[in-house]
Design a protein with these regions (language model features):
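C-terminal accessory segments
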Residues: 444-513
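Right-handed parallel beta-helix
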Residues: 93, 97-103, 126-137, 157-170, ...
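Right-handed parallel beta-helix/beta-solenoid
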Residues: 28-58, 76, 100-102, 462-468
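Bacterial N-terminal signal peptides that target proteins for export
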Residues: 1-12
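C-terminal segment of classical bacterial N-terminal signal peptides
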Residues: 17-28
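Short glycine/acidic-rich loop motifs that flank beta-strands on beta-rich extracellular proteins
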Residues: 77-82, 108-119, 139-148, 170-186, ...
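Extracellular beta-strand-rich solenoid/capping regions of secreted or surface-exposed proteins
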Residues: 58, 62-66, 78-95, 104-131, ...
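Acidic Gly/Asp/Thr-rich repetitive segments characteristic of extracellular carbohydrate-active
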Residues: 40-78, 82, 447, 478, ...
């Protein structure tokens, strides 16, 4: 795999009229909190009330106190917002949110980008909530400038980024030489760059799209980030990685805590993520570079990736390490549906012998369907360089026209357990293709005998409800039902739909119970 670098706007202006039309009343701050209001028609010398609002978000950020809520009226705000004042655990967060059903837009059109900078940024602050904004049009054509839609940096805790729409954040410079390894743009970025971590961060319900990222990522947690939840986001149509959990890039002062960790990546939908035609990936190849992951863990640890949909990307999900002698570890990938990705469904291990390893990870109860669509023979599961002590169980893998199911082109592969999976391929059991420790085997039986893998696995049609319509629930007669290995320590409590994970005699194979 070739990789270069990191893979109606205005609401009603009269609240009473809105209530008369049946709109919900605006939310209220807690009894101990204070309410402030900002409007494009306001003035920063006003009182900051609903009747006499401020004009700028920055004035509100410089004034708000712990436990307060800044209600932002609909309209366009063409200024950056830098939040450095904190809420508190006792009084509550400082919350910046849209007013009622109105949509405030923070628009970066014409604004300069200074080094690495967020259109909205939270620097060394804690107990902050940013909710219900559209954040857009923050761009540059200058190398070494990094525009970010929402940027959280330094240290802090108790930060929530909720229900925001982030789009058209771009660096359109054409990289050359060493610039291929640089950072270019992000939709949402969390960089733990201090000895104290960024902890307790929630990124939920956001939409990120039309981002020109170069060698960077759509949504990323990097460095000293400890305890995070990336949930229920929609990430699509961007030119590099969708969601990334990163370690060992030198973001934090010490390697000892330079890993995003103790995280949850759940309920996200990620699609149309591709590095093809991205100049940061060098000369365009005949089939494209196909190096951008929908969901990626690069050096992170102790994280669960579950109940996500990842499709029409270059790679569905990857757990790997780009840094030699460093490992991505203790990642559980379970109950995800991964389909129609160009190179492979799930990848693990370093992408060449100069990279790091994947160790002590679990890939369980996923449904992988017809990935490997562009003829690169990545199969449904791509086992790369230096994989150790990983568990791969209870997965459905249905091959594309390539007929490749598992592709492992490296001999440095020790202690991995592969069993209780269900496989299917257009060429049938005898014509299915497998590469294990760099040796090609044709046919399921030949692969089992030669490798010792999959002694309890099946080769059969999984009988999806409607695969043409991408409904990967199981028909009542599916051989995957009750055919898995019920290890409650790793399969999780719920399937892709949030239903109890075990309902019959044993767990089903695949994402659907």
């Amino acid at each position: 795999m070739l990789k270069f670098g990191k893979r109606a706007l205005i609401g009603l202006s009269i609240a009473a009229l809105g209530l008369a039309l049946g709109n919900a009343a605006p939310p209220k701050a807690s009894a101990a909190g204070t309410e402030y209001y900002v409007s494009p028609t306001g003035n920063d010398s006003n009182a900051g009330t609903l009747a006499s609002p401020w004009k700028t978000l920055q004035h509100a950020a410089d004034t708000a106190v712990p436990g307060s809520t800044v209600y932002v009226r609909g309209g366009t705000y063409n200024k950056k917002l830098s939040i450095t004042r904190s809420g508190s655990a006792a009084a509550g967060p400082i919350t910046f949110t849209n007013y009622a059903s109105e949509l405030p837009v923070i628009d970066g059109t014409g604004l300069s980008v200074t080094e690495e900078e967020g259109l909205v940024q939270i620097i060394d602050a804690s107990y902050i909530t940013v909710k219900g904004f559209e954040i857009r049009n923050f761009t540059t054509s200058t190398r070494n400038k990094v525009p970010v839609g929402i940027y959280v940096e330094g240290a802090g805790s108790g930060i929530s980024l909720l229900n925001n729409k982030v789009h058209d954040i771009k660096n359109t410079a054409t990289p050359t030489g060493s610039d291929l390894l640089g950072r270019d743009a992000h939709g949402i970025a969390v960089y733990g760059s201090k000895k104290s971590p960024i902890s307790g961060i929630t990124i939920d319900g956001n939409e990120l799209y039309n981002l020109v990222l170069g060698s960077s990522e759509s949504l990323v947690v990097n460095g000293n980030v400890d305890t995070f939840a990336i949930t229920n986001n929609l990430v699509h149509d961007n030119d590099n990685i969708g969601i990334d959990v990163i370690g060992f890039e030198g973001t934090a002062p010490s390697e000892a805590y330079d890993q995003a960790r103790n995280g949850l990546v759940k309920g996200n939908v990620v699609y149309n993520i591709s590095s093809n035609n991205n100049p940061s990936y060098g000369k365009t190849l005949p089939n494209g570079s196909n190096a951008a992951d929908g969901i990626y863990v690069d050096g992170g640890k102790d994280t669960v990736i579950e109940q996500n949909y990842s499709y029409n990307n270059d790679i569905g999900i990857e757990i790997a390490s780009e840094h030699k002698n460093h490992s991505t570890s203790n990642i559980t990938v379970r109950n995800n549906i991964v389909y129609n990705n160009r190179y492979t469904g799930i990848a693990m291990g370093g992408y060449d012998t100069n990279r790091g390893s994947t160790t002590d990870c679990k890939i369980v109860n996923n449904t992988l369907y017809k990935n490997d669509t562009v003829g690169l023979n990545g199969g449904q599961l791509l086992v790369q360089y230096d994989t150790k002590n990983n568990v791969i169980k209870n997965n459905i893998m249905a091959a594309s026209s390539s007929n490749y199911l598992i592709y492992n082109g490296y001999t440095q592969n020790t202690g991995n357990t592969v069993d209780y999976n269900l496989y299917f391929a257009p060429a049938g059991s005898a014509g299915s293709l497998w590469k294990w420790k760099n040796t090609l085997r044709t046919g399921f039986s030949a692969y089992q005998t030669a490798t010792g893998n999959d002694a309890h696995s099946l080769f059969a049609d999984p009988q999806f409800v409607n695969e043409a319509g991408h409904d990967f629930h199981l028909k009542a007669a599916s051989p995957a039902i009750d055919a898995g290995y019920t290890d409650t320590a790793i399969i999780g409590d719920y399937d892709i739909d949030g239903q109890p994970r075990v309902q019959g005699a044993a767990v089903n194979i695949g994402a659907d119970e």
